[in-house]
Amino acid sequence: MANVVVVGAQWGDEGKGKITDLLSKSADVVVRYQGGVNAGHTIVVKDQTLKLHLIPSGILYPDTQCIIGAGTVVDPKVLLEELEQLEQLGVSTENLLIAETAHVTMPYHRQLDIAAEERRGSRRIGTTGRGIGPTYADKSERTGIRMLDLLDRDQLAAKLEWAIAQKNLILEKLYGLAPLEPQPIIEEYSAYGERLRSHIVDGSLVLDDAIRRRRNILFEGAQGTLLDLDHGTYPYVTSSNPVAGGACVGAGIGPTMIDRVIGVAKAYTTRVGEGPFPTELLDEVGELLGDRGAEFGTTTGRRRRCGWFDAVIGRYAVRINGLDCLAITKLDVLDELPEIKVCVAYDIDGERCEHFPSNALKFARCRPIYETLPGWQQSTRHCRSLDDLPKAALNYLKFLAEIMSVPIAIVSLGAERSQTIIVEDPIHGPKRALLKDDGTQVHPILS
């Protein structure tokens, strides 16, 4: 299998959990490299649906080691709840490891997150209110609490007493909120450390050993490319780096250790929260996509905004991540539509633009330029090969592959593992198209 990164190629919620689950059966190690409880994926265990926010999908495979990397921010309370849920269903959690240098989300982070968002008013970003941004802010300011701090009560107490004194100034003076008492928090988080002690390790050392032993490693990103702190639709982004490059920093390995990058994108586009969304549909088609796709956030429960597939941001995701291939999910959601549109470029103040603009104000002025393709108006959920697909559905996939110059390796047609078409080997199959010597494009084919 080699070492593979799975990234979201849109604004998150692309169905990475299912794709990671499919690939995890061939992995020896699965690593979550960034984000926190602001992301989530749904898994099914013994006919019961679980929503996990921190634990990698590979936890369902007893021989697969799962690592929460240093680039993540960990809410220990939520993590322990997830562990207990899995154990109650008979799923072993002994194979879960947590990087000792991962930062910890504290109660004051959640309070500050919610208070800041409320204070922004009409300028709100649309955060989940889970304290992720403030946790990463403390990490950057070098005042954060790390998992290793939870294992030394005296060290934890000293750090928390200082941190809480600083946060209380902000809570009281800026937001008019009641101050926090440090002692209960010290006791609570020290207890979390004891309960998690056996899971906390030097994550980079474990990964280095796995690499040297030629183990197959799967790196699992949260959110999506367009939510990346540096490369997304800033400021309407998350506080970490979901892009493929973030896997090396967040896991603690060198870039030469990555063999392949797989992007995941829906057959249409969704977005949660605020921010520009050129292909957003505020009509009955958008409602249909939301209803058929069950578009509600795993973490917040908020209804997702829905729109047509945006190949401009798709090409951007291919470029920023160096995608080798794509997995297209939820193709079945389009089954009822008589026609399907794909945004191939933007109109910005009367000029055609085929590239994603980094300026959020400019991006907000983008108007989609569409290509319209015929729909297939029949169910695809039973299809298990390309030959089973209606011709119009196959043509739609080919169009996406060509316009983004990247092969499609996987097509998902529902939530179940069986509702999947493996077009090409996602690990060893064809890679992204290159340019000919004369500069013309070599278009990838679907099969």
UniProtKB/Swiss-Prot annotation:
Disulfide bonds: none annotated. It catalyses: IMP + L-aspartate + GTP = N(6)-(1,2-dicarboxyethyl)-AMP + GDP + phosphate + 2 H(+). GO terms for cellular component: cytoplasm. Binds 1 Mg(2+) ion per subunit. Substrate binds at T298, T299, T300, G301, R302, R303, R304. Keywords: Cytoplasm, GTP-binding, Ligase, Magnesium, Metal-binding, Nucleotide-binding, Purine biosynthesis. One of its GO terms (molecular function) is GTP binding. Its cofactor is Mg(2+). SUPFAM superfamilies: P-loop containing nucleoside triphosphate hydrolases. Pathway: Purine metabolism; AMP biosynthesis via de novo pathway; AMP from IMP: step 1/2. Its EC number is 6.3.4.4. It is found in: Cytoplasm. InterPro entries: Adenylosuccin_syn_GTP-bd, Adenylosuccin_syn_Lys_AS, Adenylosuccinate_synth_dom1, Adenylosuccinate_synth_dom2, Adenylosuccinate_synth_dom3, Adenylosuccinate_synthetase, P-loop_NTPase. HAMAP family: Adenylosucc_synth (MF_00011). Homodimer. Plays an important role in the de novo pathway of purine nucleotide biosynthesis. Catalyzes the first committed step in the biosynthesis of AMP from IMP. Belongs to the adenylosuccinate synthetase family. NCBIfam families: PRK01117.1 (NF002223), purA (TIGR00184). This is Adenylosuccinate synthetase. The lineage of its organism: Bacteria, Bacillati, Cyanobacteriota, Cyanophyceae, Acaryochloridales.
